[in-house]
Design a protein with these regions (language model features):
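Auxiliary alpha/beta "docking" domains used to position bulky ligands
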Residues: 1-106
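Short, charged low-complexity linear segments at domain edges
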Residues: 78-102, 130-149, 200-205
Length: 265
């Protein structure tokens, strides 16, 4: 997915992984097919359980221990060939296998991810302060966005990829065959703010089907769009924001007020 964060103030930004169908289900289906082939053709007595960020498994830690990559300063797992643009999944089996050893950290003295984080969410020892992370604030946080982060949210309406986009390991194109049908949703790629607002207002129930965006819920998505409109400084959006001042939803009403202040500041 060749999508870069848009700098245009009339465009919104949605994290890359949310531009496609829910990866949990896609990968789970692929792994199940793979294991059934192995079971049928190679090892009848194999038992397995699949995880795609779907259970209490320390995926990143196990991936590191198995040599898939090293932890970058932004805490993402980085592979020397793939960068950090990949999903992690696991298959637990009742067989012993040989496995690779952990690889060395190859970030060196680079601090691009730390320097580029708008909210300063990347702290020491490759840890993230979730309360400052734009991905957390726009997806997991169900309340209003803290006032000290409003401007820093920018035009991010679902997630944030900044610390990965600036990573030098993500600059090269991975040479890997991709036979997954991810079903790219073009209307999520740098959408115009007024169009994505209308889409979420009128077609949320259809848009959220098979999409990870449902995790933010409709209210969260609308909240994020209002903030992005405020940060655009574009008075064209003012009437669209103002109508939410009278919303029965206190979070949206408060956010609309915040967005107007952002627009006028």
């Amino acid at each position: 997915i060749n999508s870069k964060s848009s700098k245009e103030n009339n465009k919104a930004w949605i994290s890359r992984y949310a531009l496609i169908d829910d990866y949990h289900k896609i990968i789970n289906k692929k792994l199940k097919s793979l294991m059934e082939i192995i079971k049928l053709d190679y090892c009848e007595d194999i038992n397995y359980k699949i995880y795609v960020d779907t259970g209490p498994l320390l995926e990143r830690a196990y991936s590191y221990q198995s040599g898939l990559g090293w932890f970058g300063k932004n805490s993402c797992l980085i592979n020397k060939d793939l960068g950090s643009w990949f999903f992690i999944s696991e298959v637990l089996i009742n067989k012993k296998l040989e496995y690779d050893q952990p690889v060395k950290d190859m970030c060196g003295s680079c601090t691009k991810c730390i320097d580029s984080c708008p909210t300063g969410a990347i702290v020491d020892n490759k840890k993230i302060d979730a309360n400052k992370c734009i991905s957390y604030l726009t997806i997991e946080n169900k309340d209003t966005i803290p006032s000290n982060f409003l401007k820093k949210i920018g035009n991010n309406i679902y997630g944030c990829d900044i610390c990965q986009e600036v990573c030098p390991w993500n600059n090269k194109k991975a040479k890997i065959k991709n036979n997954f049908n991810w079903n790219l949703r073009d209307f999520f790629v740098s959408p115009e703010l007024d169009k994505i607002l209308q889409l979420i207002e009128t077609q949320w129930d259809e848009v959220k089907i098979k999409s990870p965006i449902k995790r933010a819920k409709k209210r969260g998505f609308l909240r994020n769009i209002l903030i992005a409109m405020g940060n655009s400084k574009n008075s064209y959006y003012k009437p669209k924001v103002q109508k939410y001042l009278k919303s029965d939803d206190k979070i949206l009403a408060t956010t609309a007020k915040q967005a107007i202040l952002l627009m006028e500041s």
